Swiss-Prot record:
The protein, known as: Large ribosomal subunit protein uL6
InterPro entries assigned: Ribosomal_uL6-like, Ribosomal_uL6-like_a/b-dom_sf, Ribosomal_uL6_a/b-dom, Ribosomal_uL6_bac-type, Ribosomal_uL6_CS
One example GO MF annotation: structural constituent of ribosome
GO BP annotation list: cytoplasmic translation
Subunit structure: Part of the 50S ribosomal subunit.
Transmembrane segments: none
Recorded family membership: Belongs to the universal ribosomal protein uL6 family.
Native source organism of the sequence: Neisseria gonorrhoeae (strain ATCC 700825 / FA 1090)
Gene symbol of the encoding locus: rplF
Pfam families: Ribosomal_L6 (PF00347)
Keyword presence, DNA-binding: no
UniProtKB keywords: Ribonucleoprotein, Ribosomal protein, RNA-binding, rRNA-binding
HAMAP family referenced in this protein's UniProt entry, alphabetically: Ribosomal_uL6_B (MF_01365_B)
Signal peptide start and end residues: none
Gene Ontology cellular-component terms listed: cytosolic large ribosomal subunit
């Protein structure tokens, strides 16, 4: 049995778990997420706890039970608390502005970048150099943050670009004459 799958997932109050024929549906105050059921993993719901057991003793079944537990745990946290990623713009003239589901970025190009948020992700800009992404699906929030960062990744000489808050950019030394 997977070491990750040994720990049950505690379902907090206000989160509803439903078993469908092909998917596990988790509903909470931040929305609804579904997880497709895998044939190698059995999921049981008792006393507010989800337990994951491999159906057979194969390596793949053990691995899938741990993977399923981790993904469902993230979904439970997402629909109850939500996930947040913060980005920071470093550089002269680099600005961000949120207008509903659209993020306008000025990153030193000859044109502004207009990024439309996917379903389930909201964006706020507390200041012109800060971006805060929130949503219930951890994977989608991380993917959006990664795509925004990829527009202008931090460069190693001056550190200009879009970075995660708390990210350490390793700086290089300039060429000496």
């Amino acid at each position: 049995m997977s070491r990750v799958a040994k720990n049950p997932v505690t379902v907090p109050a206000g989160v509803e778990v439903k078993f469908g024929t092909e998917a596990l549906v988790i509903k909470g105050k931040n929305g609804e997420l579904s997880f497709p059921l895998h044939s190698d993993v059995a999921i049981e719901f008792n006393d507010g706890k989800l337990t994951f057991v491999a159906n057979n003793s194969s390596k793949q079944a053990n691995a899938m039970s741990g993977t399923a537990r981790a993904l469902v745990s993230n979904m439970v946290k997402g629909v109850s608390e939500g996930f947040e990623k913060k980005l920071q713009l470093m550089g002269v003239g680099y600005r961000a502005q949120a207008q509903g589901k659209i993020l306008n970025l000025s990153l030193g190009f000859s044109h502004p970048i207009v990024y439309e948020m996917p379903e389930g992700v909201s964006v706020q800009t507390p200041s012109q150099t800060e971006i805060v992404l929130t949503g219930s699906d951890k994977q989608v929030v991380g993917q959006v943050a990664s795509e925004i960062r990829a527009f202008r990744a931090p460069e190693p000489y001056k550190g200009k670009g879009v970075r995660y808050v708390g990210e350490v950019v390793v700086m290089k030394e300039a060429k000496k004459k």
